[in-house]
Structure formats: structure tokens, C-alpha cells
Amino acid sequence: MIGGRPFRAATLTATLAAFLTSSSSAQFQTVDLVDVDVVVTDDDGKPVTGLKKDDFDVREDGKPVELKTFVSLATSEDMSVPRSMVILLDDVTMPTETVSAVKALATYLALQARPIDDLSVIRFRNQDDEPFGDRRAALARIQQYQGAPLKYAPAGAPEDVLRLIASVSKKLESTGRRRKILVCIGAPRICAVREPGRFAGGWFYGDWTTAISIAARANLSMYSVLAAPARFSGDGIVEATGGLIFRNASDFRPLLDRIWQDAGHHYLLGYWPPSSSKDVHTISVKVPRKDVHVLSRRQRGN
């Protein structure tokens, strides 16, 4: 015969385990501290320094959150702290006549890296490219870059792009809390995937949530440099991860300089998120001052 006390203990343990694994307890799930890297610039695009924790208004899903950690980083001025950048070359949609332009843009970016910076180049169709390396290896991959094999070659599917972003983010997640930047040079279909609807056209919604989730944990933001004239509207992976899209410029060099500037000047804010079972959370960061512009990720996964 089973004794009363052991039986009650076993029953309580089983009941608690069932509760913790049930869908109804999703709102009580354990959450990690959320880190948000924030770039603040003035009207001239120059970094705004000297801000304090109380200068920031941060909200998740519309609710104010209390900042628990606050770090101001200016690694561009500290030669002992590396910046982190991965350049993604679109070799799927860019025709051969654009190869020289893509190479020139990528080369300019690579040459701005300091010896201490972490820089790598990956090509969309090359599965062997890893987001690690040095400037010499990066320049070699740029020289090896080739455009699409056919002028009207099928473009990479949105889910393929999102899976690549997730893979790069995952590999860089272990490199610390510092900001990482993924710069895609190419066409919108690869470099600026639009956000899917949850139901309408949302066959890659799961890939979207995975990509923004891992990118948020890795502090990775995506920037896009559209190397050919393109008509495009926002609300995509670039905006969701806190990056910028550059296009239709007669001189891209100041824009490329801006990317390195953002990699080296930013604020890192940390907060405990409100309990929620939503798949995707919206993030809003504001600095209630005149003549300042705030750039930060807009979404994170659960």
C-alpha cells in the first residue's frame, strides 16, 4: 500500500509539471533580459553622445518598460574594441553588368575596417562561406564574386533569405552583447525581404519569427545597399532589425561610412519584458528631444 505523504507529493509534482508545460501557462514562461542597441544621431547624421538612461523612452507592445542596464558605446574611438560587420553579396538577382558596382561598394566597405574589427564576406549561393575571417579573406571573396548565372535567374525565396539571416545571427550570438551588422549589397528581393502577413501570404511567417528572434538575441541589425536603381517600400526585415536601406544614390560612400559609424556608436539598453505569449513583440525607442533621430530594432520574437 502506498503511503499518503509520498503519494500526495508525487501527485503534486505531476500536477505542477503538467501546468508548466500546458499552453495555458505560456504567459508565465521564463524570459531573458532583452538587449536593444540604439543609434541616436543629429540632423547631420552625426552620433549624439552623452545621453543618460532617463533620456530614453522604451516600450514593448505599447507598454513602458524599466531599463535595468545601460551602456554607451563608442568603439569607433576606442581602438581596443572591435566593431563587427558581415557583408552579404547578392549573387542571385544581380545581373553580370552590375558585378563591378557590387564589387566597388563591397571593397569600399571592407577597406574602412580597422585591423581590430571583425569583418567577413559571404555570398548567397556559396554554402561554404562562413561569417568569420579577416579583411584579407573578405577582399578575396569580393574579387571572386560573380553575378547571377542567368540574366533572369530565379531569385532566392524569402524563406531562404530569412534562414540565412538566422544562421548568421546564431553563429555570431556567442561573440557577446556588442552590436553586429549584416550589410546586404544587391537587389530588394534578397536584401529587403518584406514582412509576411500572419495568414495572407504568410507561408514563411515561421521563418520570419525565427529570424527576428535570433537576430535580437545576437544584437544583429541588417542594412541594405541596393546596388541598382530600385523602387521599394519599407516594412521589412531591415526595419524590423533596426537597420537602414540605402538606394538610388549618386555617391554611396557617405552612406557606407554611416554604416561603420552606426557599428561603432550606439547605446545598449536592457530590460525585463512584460509577460506575454505573443510570437512577435513590437519595440519602440524614443528620445524626447528636438533634432535627434533614433534607430533601433522594431521587433523581437518570444
State what each model feature region is.
Residues 1-13:
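Bacterial N-terminal signal peptides that target proteins for export
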